[in-house]
């Protein structure tokens, strides 16, 4: 068994270094099995006949009985429907990300209960995605410090961020300008994510084209920004996700740069200081920060990775592509207050639920994000 583990570790080190970036290989740390069991076929279909889930790009577990989903429209199924169809496009070996001509802008936002059944369908907001030439919704978040539990939805393609009431009945705020990309204080260019500081400030990961993180005050007024395009300390080749941790720490995933950039807040609310970078990833996708560690998902190979705040790899488990329970991409993940894990697949087109194994080492379980519990 030991030679196989060593071989896997060597493979991970080899593929984790982005092309064109010469660097010392990063020790992978322990590699082992997932500490979770999948709840098979949890995400129950509710689309009209002829359609399936689209790319599940955003998942946020507000509670064990309310899981918010942002999906990139629905996927038009082939007709006649093959017998092997199992409730999601991936079961037909169809990739909802690459087969964009089958995308239909309907049921873009909805919620699920603990059993994976649809609770709310926010179809009144489908028009905010209609006509999009690209993937559209990218993340869905709620600030742990917001008593009103407003829902933030980032639309990458339209360069906009929408803030909804908790029940989805009202659109409270629109940031950015639809179809207008810009690098000034009022515009975005392919925004990707949003995070929240305890004092009410908001961090906008902006994004794939602007390569910056924008800082807003509690009233959503511009304060400052940090980052910039490049491979140097604190720069980005594309900010894909962002999260906040204790001690004023800010963790931003530099997707194309294959690293995590770490910053810290300062006494000046408009400025942060660069702390460190954690290199050696291929395409880091999403992040959850806990009290003393953080978890990310990475692509090529698809995996969950746990690190401490110094960047040391503490544990890794690989995510297989094999169906019925596999993934092509864990684009987003979330954990509820009961410790259940949810992972959205942007390519197979579904969200899966995982429960901790009875014999799991608790140190290997992902907890709800810092500040949320």
PLM regions and their residue ranges:
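Positively charged n-region of N-terminal signal peptides that target proteins for export
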Residues: 1-5
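Sec/Tat signal peptide C-region and signal peptidase I cleavage site
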Residues: 18-22
């Amino acid at each position: 068994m030991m030679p196989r583990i060593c071989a896997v570790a060597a493979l991970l080190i080899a593929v984790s270094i982005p092309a064109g970036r010469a660097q010392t290989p990063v020790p992978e740390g322990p590699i082992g099995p997932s500490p979770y069991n999948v709840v098979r076929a949890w995400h129950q279909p509710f689309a009209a006949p002829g359609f399936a889930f689209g790319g599940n790009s955003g998942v946020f577990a507000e509670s064990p009985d309310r899981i918010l989903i942002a999906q990139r429209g629905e996927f038009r199924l082939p007709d006649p429907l093959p017998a092997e169809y199992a409730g999601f496009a991936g079961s037909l070996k169809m990739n909802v990300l690459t087969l964009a001509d089958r995308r239909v802008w309907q049921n873009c936002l909805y919620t699920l209960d603990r059993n994976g059944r649809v609770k709310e369908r926010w179809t009144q907001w489908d028009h905010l995605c209609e006509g999009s030439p690209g993937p559209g919704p990218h993340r869905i978040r709620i600030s742990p410090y917001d008593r009103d539990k407003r829902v933030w939805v980032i639309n990458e393609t339209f360069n906009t961020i929408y803030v909804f009431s908790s029940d989805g009945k009202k659109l409270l705020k629109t940031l950015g300008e639809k179809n207008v990309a810009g690098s000034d204080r009022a515009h975005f260019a392919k925004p990707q994510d949003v995070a929240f500081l305890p004092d009410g400030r908001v961090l906008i990961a902006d994004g794939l084209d602007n390569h910056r993180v924008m800082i807003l005050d509690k009233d959503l007024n511009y304060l400052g920004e940090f980052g910039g395009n490049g491979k140097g300390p604190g720069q980005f080749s594309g900010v894909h996700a962002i999260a906040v941790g204790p001690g004023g720490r800010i963790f931003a995933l530099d997707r194309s740069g294959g690293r995590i950039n770490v910053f810290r807040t300062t006494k000046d609310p408009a400025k942060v200081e660069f702390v460190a970078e954690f290199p050696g990833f291929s395409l880091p996708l999403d992040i959850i920060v806990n009290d003393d560690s953080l978890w990310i998902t990475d692509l090529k190979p698809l995996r969950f990775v746990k690190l401490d705040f110094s960047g040391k790899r503490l544990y890794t488990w690989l995510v297989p592509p094999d169906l019925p329970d596999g993934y092509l991409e864990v684009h987003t993940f979330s954990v509820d207050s009961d410790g259940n894990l949810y992972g959205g697949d942007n390519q197979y087109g579904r969200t899966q639920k995982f429960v901790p194994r009875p014999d799991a080492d608790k140190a290997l379980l992902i907890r709800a994000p810092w500040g949320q519990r």
